[in-house]
From Swiss-Prot:
This is Large ribosomal subunit protein uL6. Belongs to the universal ribosomal protein uL6 family. GO terms for cellular component: cytosolic large ribosomal subunit. The lineage of its organism: Bacteria, Pseudomonadati, Pseudomonadota, Betaproteobacteria, Burkholderiales. One of its GO terms (molecular function) is structural constituent of ribosome. The gene is rplF. Keywords: Ribonucleoprotein, Ribosomal protein, RNA-binding, rRNA-binding. PANTHER family: 60S/50S RIBOSOMAL PROTEIN L6/L9, LARGE RIBOSOMAL SUBUNIT PROTEIN UL6M. One of its GO terms (biological process) is cytoplasmic translation.
Length: 176
C-alpha cells in the first residue's frame, strides 16, 4: 500500500461530506468538491479521514496516495488557503491588480492583461511583487505559471517574472 495513502488526514476544523462518489470539504474560506476514484475507500473517523485501496492492485495503491494528497490539499485550502508569490525583475516591469484582472507591463509594446479565474485573487503589495491567493492549490499554481509564462526569467541578465523562491542561474556572456 502507498506510504502517503496510509497516513490519516486531520480535518483541522473543516466539515467533510461523503456522497455519490464525491467528497465535499467545507471550511471558513470556502467549499471544494472532489470526485473520488472508485478504487479508493474513504472513511471518516472522528476528525480524521482514512483512505484505503479497494483491492491490492498496483493502480488502487497508487490512486490511494494520490487521492489522499488531493483531499489533504482541499482541507488545507478551505482552512488556511494557498498563496504563490511572484517577483518582477527588470527595468520598467510593473504589475497592478484591478479587481479580477492583473495588468502587467513587461517590456512588450502593449500591456498584458491577465483575467483571474473564479476563486483566485491577485494582490500587488509593491509594483514588482504579485501575490496569488486561493483555496484550490492546483488553480493557484496554474495561474502563477501562466503569469510567469508571459516573460520567464532569461538566463543572461535574469530579467522576467520569477517565483519569489526561484533561483535563476545566470550564464556567462560570450567572450571575444
Amino acid at each position: 500500500m502507498s506510504r502517503v495513502g496510509k497516513s490519516p488526514i486531520a480535518l483541522q476544523g473543516a466539515e467533510v461530506k461523503l456522497a455519490d462518489g464525491a467528497i465535499t470539504v467545507k471550511g471558513p474560506l470556502g467549499t471544494i468538491t472532489q470526485a473520488i476514484n472508485p478504487l479508493v475507500n474513504v472513511a471518516n473517523n472522528d476528525g480524521t479521514l482514512n483512505l484505503s485501496p479497494v483491492d491490492e492492485s498496483r493502480e488502487a495503491n497508487a490512486l490511494s496516495g494520490t487521492m489522499r494528497a488531493i483531499i489533504a490539499n482541499a482541507v488545507q485550502g478551505v482552512t488556511k488557503g494557498f498563496e504563490r508569490k511572484l517577483t518582477l525583475v527588470g527595468v520598467g516591469y510593473r504589475a497592478q491588480a484591478q479587481g479580477d484582472k492583473l495588468n502587467l507591463s513587461l517590456g512588450f509594446s502593449h500591456p498584458v492583461v491577465h483575467q483571474m479565474p473564479e476563486g483566485v485573487k491577485a494582490e500587488t503589495p509593491t509594483q514588482t511583487e504579485i501575490v496569488i491567493k486561493g483555496i484550490n492549490k492546483q488553480q493557484v499554481g496554474q495561474v502563477a505559471a501562466e503569469v510567469r509564462g508571459y516573460r520567464p526569467p532569461e538566463p543572461y541578465k535574469g530579467k522576467g517574472v520569477r517565483y519569489s523562491d526561484e533561483v535563476v542561474i545566470l550564464k556567462e556572456t560570450k567572450k571575444k
